[in-house]
């Protein structure tokens, strides 16, 4: 009996998994896979940094460059503090959206301190990449913004906001709404 090209296991059928009918499975995957990985790496608390993706180290005259270095330094100090806390059984990790600019600066500060840092990137039509300072085991790429924001805030014990654009404002207002409605504290 010849194996049919239609006889695929549903979970191995890429065409199905990318279809509208499988959207719920993709959403569930973006909940369960990060949960499993964060549990494996014992990440129970994060310090979430947000801010402009446009802040560049090379652009000395840009007003955002100052914030890049401030985010990097603050993240460095918080990561050093988190390393001391880890010895007491608490595992704080720096968390960002995983992209360039302020996100890179925060991941870079944690990397410089030899601490763990997490990046939660989003799949976009234009070039979007994970910055090189993220701990590889804590690198995530999401398809859905709402799942990305869920994980950015779910383990957050502190939120640090730097100047940014619409994405930063969206994340700030989402956080404030969740605090105001007692969904997070």
Model-derived features: where do they sit?
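Glycine-rich beta-alpha loop segments
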Residues: 3, 8, 14-120, 128
């Amino acid at each position: 009996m010849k194996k049919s090209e239609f006889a695929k296991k549903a979970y191995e059928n890429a065409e199905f998994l990318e279809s509208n009918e499988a959207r719920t499975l993709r959403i569930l995957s973006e909940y369960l896979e990060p949960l499993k990985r964060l549990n494996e790496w014992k990440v129970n608390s994060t310090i979430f940094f947000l801010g402009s993706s446009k802040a560049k180290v090379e652009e000395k005259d840009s007003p955002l460059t100052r914030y890049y270095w401030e985010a990097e330094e603050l993240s460095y100090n918080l990561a050093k503090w988190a390393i001391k806390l880890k010895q007491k059984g608490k595992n704080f990790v720096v968390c960002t959206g995983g992209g360039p600019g302020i996100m890179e600066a925060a991941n870079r500060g944690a990397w410089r301190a030899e601490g763990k840092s997490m990046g939660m990137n989003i799949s976009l039509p234009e070039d979007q990449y994970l910055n090189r300072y993220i701990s590889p085991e804590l690198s995530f790429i999401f398809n859905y913004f709402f799942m990305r924001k869920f994980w950015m805030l779910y383990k957050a014990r502190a939120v640090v906001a730097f100047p940014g654009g619409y994405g930063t404002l969206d994340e700030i207002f989402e956080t404030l709404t969740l605090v105001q409605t007692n969904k997070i504290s």
